[in-house]
């Protein structure tokens, strides 16, 4: 009997070892260490992202002089995708999607545009996209399509805040900071400031708390995680993910010492919790230029780094953006 019990115990241990946890349904093994948007890193580290190969494109619609192609079939909440318009003698291309005006950027003989869905965008098949193509002779054509938005994959986290940190649960502070940032990422620079090497992580270190996580603080305050956390220590140099222009460099309540960079065509990257910053508003920065050093400023209980990315005014998954093929 003892031999049988021992055998059953060994089998149970093996099964528990190999069975993966479903992050969508399983809460984290321990709550975040603080009460903010960006807790000290928790959970298992995620592998560093790698840029994908060029995917196949699908022609969605066409006129007699231009055609619209998608590099995607459906758009998950919180993600970014790529579109392409091909044709002869095209001068410029713009699109309207979910109230956002999207400028396409030229690469060789094609025009490419970034399309994004916010992490709380309702799902559905019939999301109208209108693409306006202007030709060199001044004539125009419109290419109409529908974009399907599907559910994103996000985890849930319950966070307990100590009584002496109750000020972190102030919803007005949360909303005020988000509104301030959204007024910046909602602007548009009709210029591509990044180069063909694309974007990269600001710190080459383990990824931890993911984008889009549903967070409930003390059972009352509900928030969403607008970026990814990167495990680090104090004083590590932070690099610009791509070339761009600094539109904010200062201190925020939640994000602490913070830098926001405009990369053009609706793409912004945000860097939070610096101990020191080395750039100023209006400054042009190169890819891999050091912006400052990591710290624990703002709403955090320990050194870590929060990196976020916005496209067309929406916070999107910065790691998915890195993994997406870009021309």
Q: What would you call each of these model-derived segments?
A:
Residues 1-6:
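Positively charged n-region of N-terminal signal peptides that target proteins for export
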Residues 7-17:
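Bacterial N-terminal signal peptides
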Residues 24-145, 151:
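Cationic-aromatic interfacial patches
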Residues 143-255:
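Surface-exposed, glycine-biased beta-strand/turn segments
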Residues 226, 241-275, 303-308:
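Zn2+-dependent peptidoglycan hydrolase active-site motif and core
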Residues 237-247, 276-294:
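Short, well-structured beta-strand-loop connectors
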Residues 257-260, 267, 283-327:
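Conserved, short, structured surface segments that act as functional micro-motifs
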């Amino acid at each position: 009997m003892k031999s049988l019990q021992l055998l059953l115990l060994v089998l149970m241990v093996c099964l528990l070892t190999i069975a993966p946890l479903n992050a969508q349904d399983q809460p984290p093994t321990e709550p975040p260490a603080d009460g903010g948007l960006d807790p000290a890193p928790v959970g298992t580290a995620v592998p560093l992202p790698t840029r994908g190969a060029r995917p196949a494109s699908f022609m969605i619609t066409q006129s007699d002089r231009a055609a619209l192609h998608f590099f995607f079939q459906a758009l998950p909440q919180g993600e970014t995708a790529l579109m392409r318009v091909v044709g002869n003698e095209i001068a410029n291309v713009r699109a309207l999607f979910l109230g956002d005006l999207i400028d396409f950027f030229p690469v060789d003989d094609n025009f490419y545009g970034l399309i994004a869905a916010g992490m709380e965008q309702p799902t559905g098949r019939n999301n109208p996209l209108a693409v306006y193509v202007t030709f060199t002779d001044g004539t125009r054509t419109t290419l109409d399509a529908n974009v399907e938005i599907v559910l994103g994959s996000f985890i849930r986290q319950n966070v307990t805040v100590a009584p002496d940190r109750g000020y972190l649960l102030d919803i007005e502070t949360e909303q005020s900071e988000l509104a301030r940032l959204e007024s910046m990422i909602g602007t548009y620079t009709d210029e591509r400031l990044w180069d063909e090497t694309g974007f990269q992580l600001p710190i080459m270190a383990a990824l931890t708390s993911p984008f889009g996580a549903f967070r409930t603080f003390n059972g009352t305050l509900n928030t969403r995680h607008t970026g990814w956390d990167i495990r680090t220590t104090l004083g590590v140099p932070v690099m610009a993910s791509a070339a761009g222009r600094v539109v904010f460099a200062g201190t925020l309540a939640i994000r602490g010492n913070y830098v926001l960079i405009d990369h053009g065509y609706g793409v912004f990257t945000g860097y939070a919790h610096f101990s020191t910053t080395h750039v100023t508003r209006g400054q042009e920065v190169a890819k891999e230029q050091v912006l400052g050093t990591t710290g624990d400023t703002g709403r955090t209980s320990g050194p870590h780094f929060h990196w976020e990315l916005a496209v067309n005014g929406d916070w999107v998954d910065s790691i998915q953006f890195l993994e997406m093929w870009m021309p």
